[in-house]
């Protein structure tokens, strides 16, 4: 004869195996997603949720109850099986219905719809009366069956409680709201006035900055005008210098090729850009000094060949 405890132990083993499978599925999913996890934390969280859902949904008790029914049937006690003849058809249909019901119960439990809410919704329904604010509470067939089976109790503590009617002092409420409104209005006005003062200060700073910028722009314009005038004066001076040197060069008794060479150097001076003009004049002066140095060395050599001596006075 099969003991009832053996059947219940088999069901408990199946439930524990389902829990282990849930833990493995959770950790495997986290690993596939590349998420780091603490195994002990995952185990604790899954166990807490699993135990709550299995207990609150009634799935655990349902499976254990069916195990007891099966054990009693195997031991020759068919009372439980006979009581369930109204919903039994065949093992496949019953298994499918049980699976769907258990799945629904666990889904509702995981969404926060606990056993109390599910039982009350299954036992009662509300019917609205058209044109009235009241309604009729209707008992379902499940409630009727529970009454017949003696599964309904009356809690007198709720009946004896007296309903307290609160008297609302609307004037006091209005005064409180008015004070809150005035306080809020004052804070808004203070913030607005502060904002206005800040805006005025910002405008003053902006106008002051604009005046400074305007003054600096005027100074820059004056400096630009002075630089333009100075550049024009330098261009005129360099042009006069070149003309004066050319005139003086033509009055010298130098060979024509020497005059031509010097004139070419004078004409190469950049009269538009004063900086370049200074560089060109420096180059011209260096060339003249170099030519003078070469001429002096030639004269010195000739004097030595002629046995003459020279001296500066």
From Swiss-Prot:
Q: What CDD domains does the annotation carry?
A: NSP3_rotavirus (cd20714)
A molecular function GO annotation: RNA binding
Question: Residue ranges of region Dimerization?
Answer: 150-206
BP term (GO), one: regulation of translation
Specify where it is mainly localized. host cell
Query: Which protein family is named in the record?
Result: Belongs to the rotavirus NSP3 family.
Subunit note: Homodimer. Interacts (via the coiled-coil region) with host ZC3H7B (via LD motif). Interacts with host EIF4G1.
Main function = Plays an important role in stimulating the translation of viral mRNAs. These mRNAs are capped but not polyadenylated, instead terminating in a conserved sequence 'GACC' at the 3' that is recognized by NSP3, which competes with host PABPC1 for EIF4G1 binding. The interaction between NSP3 and host EIF4G1 stabilizes the EIF4E-EIF4G1 interaction, thereby facilitating the initiation of capped mRNA translation.
Q: What is this protein called?
A: Non-structural protein 3
Organism encoding this protein? Rotavirus A (strain RVA/Human/United Kingdom/ST3/1975/G4P2A[6]) (RV-A)
